[in-house]
Amino acid sequence: MEEIKPASASCVSKEKPSKVSDLISRFEGGSSLSNYSDLKKESAVNLNAPRTPGRHGLTTTPQQKLLSQHLPQRQGNDTDKTQGAQTCVANGVMAAQNQMECEEEKAATLSSDTSIQASEPLLDTHIVNGERDETATAPASPTTDSCDGNASDSSYRTPGIGPVLPLEERGAETETKVQERENGESPLELEQLDQHHEMKETNEQKLHKIANELLLTERAYVNRLDLLDQVFYCKLLEEANRGSFPAEMVNKIFSNISSINAFHSKFLLPELEKRMQEWETTPRIGDILQKLAPFLKMYGEYVKGFDNAMELVKNMTERIPQFKSVVEEIQKQKICGSLTLQHHMLEPVQRIPRYEMLLKDYLRKLPPDSLDWNDAKKSLEIISTAASHSNSAIRKMENLKKLLEIYEMLGEEEDIVNPSNELIKEGQILKLAARNTSAQERYLFLFNNMLLYCVPKFSLVGSKFTVRTRVGIDGMKIVETQNEEYPHTFQVSGKERTLELQASSAQDKEEWIKALQETIDAFHQRHETFRNAIAKDNDIHSEVSTAELGKRAPRWIRDNEVTMCMKCKEPFNALTRRRHHCRACGYVVCWKCSDYKAQLEYDGGKLSKVCKDCYQIISGFTDSEEKKRKGILEIESAEVSGNSVVCSFLQYMEKSKPWQKAWCVIPKQDPLVLYMYGAPQDVRAQATIPLLGYVVDEMPRSADLPHSFKLTQSKSVHSFAADSEELKQKWLKVILLAVTGETPGGPNEHPATLDDHPEPKKKSEC
């Protein structure tokens, strides 16, 4: 019996017919007997060499694996035929001139292998690359290829199963592997080296891609800076120079945007463009970004004033029509991309974190031994520090945006848009009625300092909720209750109201209790810090006794040590309640609590700003003096009515609220402000309206009261109605001057004074 080696290749080509024909024509035209023996050696090496997946996609087909696993060994001494026969397989392609010889020898061995055929499994040929499916009805017999001593599969093999290398490349690869084995190297080591080479090339490509992304985003960023600097800023400054609004406000909004634009457009962007052109010789960006470090101070100034800028844009858009008109006109242009001014102003804040992200990705791909490693790492450290400040500003902007959304959902009636307010949690919940314990649908907005308890509105447009109760976090307690009929209940007890609430599930209940308790704890921690600061300050100031106030310079409390006025405890904000220092005790107080002046001995007897308490101790005061120094709403009605341009009772209505009678006064000392009191002798005004910028509508609607008129500015609408047409015209004469900024002189005889009306006690209640 002959010994048959396991089959590892087929005489049938795995290439498509076109490639087979091409290879056959090559062999027919250029093969010789001398080359044929060489071909035999190469093919024998190829067939015996292990075929592992590699760069060129060499794979072993399922049929080849099956044959190699199940072919039996043929015992015998007849090896002359297998050793002396010519090879009929060359790299998996049948040579045309030897095909007939191979077929004859296969036929000769077919009859002697019947027993072997019976033991072989059936092989099916499936559709490959769209070819038809042919299933062998007879056992597929592995026959001995007399050309090289290997068994070949006689079943039908579909072309195109895997890529086949050209003969020259296949032979070269085989010789390399043989040489490796002779040198003691394994094919796996070569494969790892190849993969390492490919990885190196891949990293280089990724580094170039990151650098190119930096360049592309920098171009887009410079375009945004041009939009802010050359369009928004310039157009608004032109309008301000016409006298529509102060130019100083425009400068505060845009801060140092011109300097930032100049740096990026004239330095950083040209440097990046030049470097990308020279990337083949200088593949690095760390040295360029390191030059960015000294200019990050510009971003610090921009980010620091960002909150104030956003507040200014909001207020000026609402109150100044000319400002709003210019901004909206620019926002309609294609260059804005349907985005608002506030959105574009956020671009510089977001840019620094973008640099940080790209640099981190760049360093991950950069080899540690690269020349750019140290520069890139140093740049990342500097930029990461600046990015932390930018991220803080982004979070504040996102929080402010959310507050505006809630403000609109509540019908713009709750004053919640304040940088000090932070939304913690919101969601739907059920409220258990006290009388019949029925469950009613409610909605909660939890902030860091209050809980808004709201009732849903079932309307397609407008506000979605009505605020039923505002419960302060100060003094709030959370109690977990047990109710068999109503599960998942808990109680929120505050100074303003106690609510028994029902969550939708045990998890929802747990989340609400956790959020509420953490908010309460954080609130108390802030106030504890505040109280400790005061106590510590009192210890430090123990040397400055009451008798020494004004005689000895105090230690000033730092601005960042407090978040609220140390006298009235109202929270500070950048726009309406700024920080001031009392020159006598050093406390940080608001404008209202520091609206006093006293002579301080340690400062040479100069009049200096002091708080209310220090003013009382240093100067002493009378009741009348105290009244003169009260806030704008605390000015007594009798004071302004006796020295006013016009004053009388008017019917007043705001938004959808009902009409109510109010004592209205425009004083001579403040002729551009309308004061409204409940009665002529009230010591505090209910509201004030700065008249500058309002639009006056003299024509009442049919639904309004007779002799009515309206004051409109942005979303604020105030409706008034006089008792007569004559009184209405007297008011309009004064108001029409005030809304344009002109100061009415005011006649000696007031158009409508207290003498024109009986005492309030004789009239109906307001």
Swiss-Prot record:
Localization: Cytoplasm, Cytoskeleton; Cell projection, Filopodium
Skewed-composition ranges (Basic and acidic residues): 167-184, 752-766
Predominant location: cytoplasm
Residues bound to Zn(2+) 2: 582, 585, 611, 614
SUPFAM superfamilies according to UniProt: DBL homology domain (DH-domain), PH domain-like
Polar residues composition-biased segments: 58-83, 145-157
Top-level taxon of origin: Eukaryota
Region (Actin filament-binding): 1-150
All copies of domain PH, residue ranges: 422-521, 643-740
Keywords: Actin-binding, Cell projection, Charcot-Marie-Tooth disease, Cytoplasm, Cytoskeleton, Disease variant, Guanine-nucleotide releasing factor, Metal-binding, Neurodegeneration, Neuropathy, Phosphoprotein, Repeat, Zinc, Zinc-finger
Zn-finger (FYVE-type) residues: 559-619
One Gene Ontology cellular component: cytoplasm
Coiled-coil residues: none
The protein's name: FYVE, RhoGEF and PH domain-containing protein 4
Organism phylogeny: Eukaryota, Metazoa, Chordata, Craniata, Vertebrata
